Amino acid sequence: MLSADDKKIIAQLWEKVAGHQDEFGNEALQRMFVTYPQTKTYFPHFDVHPGSEQVRSHGKKVAAALGNAVKSLDNISQALSELSNLHAYNLRVDPANFKLLSQCFQVVLAVHLGKDYTPEMHAAFDKFLSAVAAVLAEKYR
C-alpha cells in the first residue's frame, strides 16, 4: 500500500522522468534482455538487438503504462486492467518477469538521475513498481 508520502514522492520522481520516459523504457528493456536473456522468449517476433525499433516501440509502451499508473496511484488496478488481461490471457507472460523489468527500470533511474534519485525515491518507487507487478499478475490467480 502506498502512503500519501510515497504517492507524493512518486509524482515528483515521474516529473523528473518526463521527457525521458521513452528512452528509459527502451533502456530498461535492453537491460532486461541482456541481464535476463530468458525473457527474450516472450518476444520471439522482436529484433532484440540494441537500437531495435521494436524494442524502442515496446519501451515506449512500458513507459506509457507506468505513466498511466502514476496518474492513477489511487487505483492502479483499474488503470492497468486491460494490460493485466493482455499479459495473463493472451501473452501468458510469467509474472516473475515483471519484477525483473522493475529492477532494470530502477537501475536506469539510478544511472540517469544520479544523486537526484534519493533513497526515499528509490524506496517509494520500489513500492510502486511492486504494486504495478502485483496488478499485472493478479489475473493469473
UniProtKB/Swiss-Prot annotation:
Binding of heme b, residues: 58, 87
Occurrences of domain Globin (ranges): 1-141
Tissue expression: Red blood cells.
Origin: domain of life: Eukaryota
Disulfide bonds: none
Pfam families: Globin (PF00042)
UniProt keyword terms in alphabetical order: Heme, Iron, Metal-binding, Oxygen transport, Transport
Keyword Transport found: yes
UniProt GO molecular function: haptoglobin binding; heme binding; iron ion binding; organic acid binding; oxygen binding; oxygen carrier activity; peroxidase activity
Entry keyword Transport: yes
Gene Ontology cellular component terms for the protein in this record: blood microparticle; haptoglobin-hemoglobin complex; hemoglobin complex
GO-annotated biological processes: hydrogen peroxide catabolic process
SUPFAM superfamilies per the UniProt record, alphabetical: Globin-like (SSF46458)
Subunit structure: Heterotetramer of two alpha-D chains and two beta chains.
Stated family: Belongs to the globin family.
Function, in words: Involved in oxygen transport from the lung to the various peripheral tissues.
Protein name (database record): Hemoglobin subunit alpha-D
Origin species: Anser indicus (Bar-headed goose)
Gene: HBAD
